């Protein structure tokens, strides 16, 4: 099974980036390293079933079983003790990463209400891009009738680009709908 976005990267994006940035070697061309999807589940302190629902949602969206993240410190004002489950996250690499990015750009983002494109200011200065989604139901993998609560999720796209300009060019050519 070949992933559509990976083929596009090697056939179209790599030659275009080599020409644009005048790279001498193909190994200098920025590439996707990993995508991290994180869901913070604050209500898990009172409701233990919320973590299970978040695990199922993230597994359906990404195709990979997420790991449960736990609190590092106790915070009395949040009624939180160290070691309590407070979120779920999954790190995608390889084919699953390209497949997820393809579905994010072509299916999920256009389904957001009043969507005009993602912001260019969400780069971190080192070539990585972060985006937050307010609801998980924009993914077609989630059945609206089976969710217990609308949760947001954060998506961090890590690239090998040394700066934001190269990362922007890479993501733009891969199909990320930026607001210009």
Curated annotation (Swiss-Prot):
This protein's record includes keyword rRNA-binding: yes
Gene3D superfamilies reported for this sequence: 3.30.1440.10
Signal is among the record's keywords: no
Cited InterPro entries: Ribosomal_uL5, Ribosomal_uL5_bac-type, Ribosomal_uL5_C, Ribosomal_uL5_CS, Ribosomal_uL5_dom_sf, Ribosomal_uL5_N
PROSITE patterns with a match to the protein in the record: RIBOSOMAL_L5 (PS00358)
Cellular component per GO, a single term: ribonucleoprotein complex
Single GO MF descriptor: tRNA binding
One Pfam family cited in the UniProt record for this chain: Ribosomal_L5
GO BP, sorted A to Z: translation
Keywords: Ribonucleoprotein, Ribosomal protein, RNA-binding, rRNA-binding, tRNA-binding
Role this protein plays: This is one of the proteins that bind and probably mediate the attachment of the 5S RNA into the large ribosomal subunit, where it forms part of the central protuberance. In the 70S ribosome it contacts protein S13 of the 30S subunit (bridge B1b), connecting the 2 subunits; this bridge is implicated in subunit movement. Contacts the P site tRNA; the 5S rRNA and some of its associated proteins might help stabilize positioning of ribosome-bound tRNAs.
Quaternary structure and partners: Part of the 50S ribosomal subunit; part of the 5S rRNA/L5/L18/L25 subcomplex. Contacts the 5S rRNA and the P site tRNA. Forms a bridge to the 30S subunit in the 70S ribosome.
UniProt similarity note: Belongs to the universal ribosomal protein uL5 family.
Protein name per Swiss-Prot or TrEMBL: Large ribosomal subunit protein uL5
Lineage: Bacteria, Bacillati, Chloroflexota, Chloroflexia, Chloroflexales
Chain's gene name: rplE
């Amino acid at each position: 099974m070949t992933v559509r976005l990976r083929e596009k990267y090697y056939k179209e994006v790599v030659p275009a980036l080599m020409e644009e940035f005048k790279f001498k070697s193909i190994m200098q061309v920025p590439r996707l390293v990993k995508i991290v999807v994180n869901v913070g589940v604050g209500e898990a302190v009172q409701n233990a079933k919320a973590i299970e629902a978040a695990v199922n949602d993230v597994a359906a969206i990404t195709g990979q079983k997420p790991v449960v993240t736990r609190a590092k410190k106790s915070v009395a004002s949040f009624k939180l003790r160290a070691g309590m489950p407070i979120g779920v996250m999954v790190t995608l690499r390889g084919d699953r990463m390209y497949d997820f990015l393809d579905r994010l750009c072509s299916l999920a983002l256009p389904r957001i209400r009043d969507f005009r494109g993602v912001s260019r200011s969400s780069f971190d200065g080192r070539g990585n891009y972060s985006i937050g989604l307010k609801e998980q139901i924009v993914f077609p993998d989630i059945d609206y009738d089976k969710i217990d609560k609308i949760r947001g999720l954060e998506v961090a796209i890590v690239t090998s680009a040394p700066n934001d300009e190269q990362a922007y060019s890479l993501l733009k050519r891969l199909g990320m709908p930026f607001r210009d």
